[in-house]
Amino acid sequence: MAASHSPFTRFVHGESFAGLLLVGTALIAFIWANSPWRETYFAAQHTHLALSLGDARLDLSLEHWVNDGLMAVFFLLVGLEIKRELLIGELSSRRRVALAVTAALGGMLVPAALYTALNVGGPGLSGWGVPMSTDIAFALGVLALLGSRVPLGLKVFLTALAIVDDLGAVLVIALFYTSGLNLTFLTLAALTWGAALYAGWRGAFSLKLYGVLGVLLWFFVLKSGLHATIAGVLLAFAVPIRRPDPADYLASLAEAAKPGRGEVVGARLRDLEDLLERAQSPLHRLEHALHPFVTFLVLPVFALTNAGVPVAAGGFGSVSLGVLLGLLLGKPLGVVGGAWLAVRMGMASLPRRVNWGHMVGSGLLAGIGFTMSLFVSNLAFDDSVLLTQAKLGVLLASVLAALLGAGWLLLGIRGQAPSGRDDVQVDLPR
């Protein structure tokens, strides 16, 4: 099978387009926020929308609906991808997961340490989590633009790295950017999640069931004081990945295919449709359904809502510098250092056709923080000046990381032979 038809290559192309779409919407937002019409941008951000159901009422600004509501769907997709990769994907192999985890840990700890060193004792210290994340869509978008110059094993590694990175970001948000918990709603959220876990354990295949439980979980988490997006990750880990028993499936398929009268045939056709839908696991069906929604709506709307940074409002302070150095310097140092440690200790080896020059390039691209870094910025800062500084640092670092990473990989390390073994098995063109 050609590489263009392999599932992973299709995934990379999808993420690549998402990255290009993010660039476009972010650029529109940035220009709009610094244009003579900038007041309309910020007025739209703070326009309130309310939903009422009986006595319950939820009144949030458009910015909060995007960051707390739509982004919960993004985190649901992230959670589904993490679960899939852990159980049957690139993170299911001990050696592969060791390389991704050590590289991701280095890529989170070193940027956070650099940022902290530059902001210790100052009002911007709470932003230490901002430079810890990698935007998988942006990073893979840059790799896709480089075409065949980049070995597929590097794309697989960067994807696994970003997924572990996302998991780390979720934990950081849950543990360090949460305050003022409401125990009543926290209990209701726990009970709802327990119901979802029980449904998954019992093998419930209805996506509508998980949808209803997900909406309730999101509302309770929002009201509990935890960030609402955590609900997306919690729900993802409840959605089952196993498929129906093949023997039962084939028996039901044979029964539904038997000839009969018109009304019987109609009923059996509906049974066949249901069986075909259930042939895939709920996790795969939900992931497949959410991907275009997140790619074409959630992330572009998030970029449009959050990338409008007025340059003159906050200036370039220690927060901006900490984010910039954390992503541009801390990320490659941490990623390459973590990967080197895993290889040195015999825990892992580099993917096929990937050398240390490639790993430096991937470390530079990991400095494209964009989506997650902007998201954490909103949680870290209440002060508008510090928030503007953080966002300015994220945008500048993401652009520079993309240019430096692409430039490094284009130049190549031609004199250095690939040192990785065939750890990544993929379909290549014949």
From Swiss-Prot:
Topology in the membrane?
Multi-pass membrane protein
Which Pfam family is one of those matched by this entry?
Na_H_antiport_1
* Annotated localization: Cell membrane
Membrane-crossing residue ranges in chain numbering = 11-31, 60-80, 97-117, 127-147, 181-201, 215-235, 288-308, 309-329, 356-376, 393-413
The GO terms describing molecular function are: sodium:proton antiporter activity
Known role: Na(+)/H(+) antiporter that extrudes sodium in exchange for external protons.
Q: By what name is this protein known?
A: Na(+)/H(+) antiporter NhaA 2
Q: Which organism is it from?
A: Deinococcus geothermalis (strain DSM 11300 / CIP 105573 / AG-3a)
Origin organism lineage? Bacteria, Thermotogati, Deinococcota, Deinococci, Deinococcales
Q: Which gene encodes it?
A: nhaA2
